[in-house]
Amino acid sequence: MVRLSIAIALIAALASCGGDKTSSQAAKASISTQGSSDNRVAKEVFGRVATSSSGRPQSFGEDARGCQAGAVQLPQTGPTWQAMRLSRNRNWAQPQTVDYIQDLSRFAATQSGWSGLYVGDMSQPRGGPMLTGHASHQTGLDADIWMLPPNRLNLSAAERESLSSISMRRASGAFVNSSWTPQHEAILKAAASDPRVARIFLFPGAKVEMCKNATGDRSWLRKIRPWWGHHYHFHVRLNCPAGTAGCEDQAPPPPGDGCAEAQGWVDRILNPPPPKPADPNATPTPRRGPLKISQLPGQCTSVINN
């Protein structure tokens, strides 16, 4: 059991689109890892379920090794948002995530040139690993928000498949490009200032730009975390709902606004450190296979069977 816990922590720390990871040991104590001998590949099961499970809403596990019960669906179109890429069926989440997106979209609609938000991937109906794309987004507490300012919110289903967001980065993410606007900064500030938010992943140059421009209270910058990619969208991760057993939060970001750290990312993009010499005596890292249902929190077996 000890070896299993260590393996879970190490694998989760390497998951993509969910970096900056430090696990909460207290939360892990309430996550069941026993009672399942189901060795089916988890993404092949969770990725093909079309509807949410019964029962009250609840997240189990962590962003890159978990699932969700009682998920609700973000309506495909609302007064200030549209869900994109409907064919993926990834506009499901925990109720607080849906509420958060709707709240943020109402703020976005107050910004010049923005009718609201185009919302990218959230989670699958029962969370869990996906057939393609993200390693995270498994517990109903993650959402991708497009950088493209919506100029209309009556896109057809076909248009939502073909329309693409736009990149905000220049010089491999060291700087923002000419598409970046004060409205992007205002929306990100509002997104990060919400107490429901744990962190937001964004390319380094955008964080450095906001650090330069921020005035007054800068505490919200702490939640903006530099990470690879994330220039066509920003990735919001919410905290586990208060009092939820079985949901594992990451540790909070380090104290401070994180601006020096983001500048360090930029410096390394512009002046990459020399590669480390290969160790001829190093033991090759074994390849990790896809997650099995038996490797997810034990509650996920019930989630997939209900």
What are these regions (language model features)?
Residues 1-6:
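Bacterial N-terminal signal peptides that target proteins for export
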Residues 14-16:
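C-terminal motif of bacterial Sec signal peptides marking the signal peptidase cleavage site
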Residues 22-35, 39, 155-306:
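Catalytic cores and adjacent binding grooves of peptidoglycan-active enzymes
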Residues 45-48, 100-132, 201-223:
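Extended, low-complexity, intrinsically disordered C-terminal regulatory tails
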Residues 49, 54-120, 180-189, 194-197:
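Active-site acidic/histidine clusters and adjacent loop/turn architecture
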Residues 59-60, 147-157:
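Short, solvent-exposed beta-strand-terminating loops
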Residues 112-114, 138-142, 231-233:
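Extracytoplasmic
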Residues 132-149:
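Short, surface-exposed glycine/acidic/tryptophan-bearing loops
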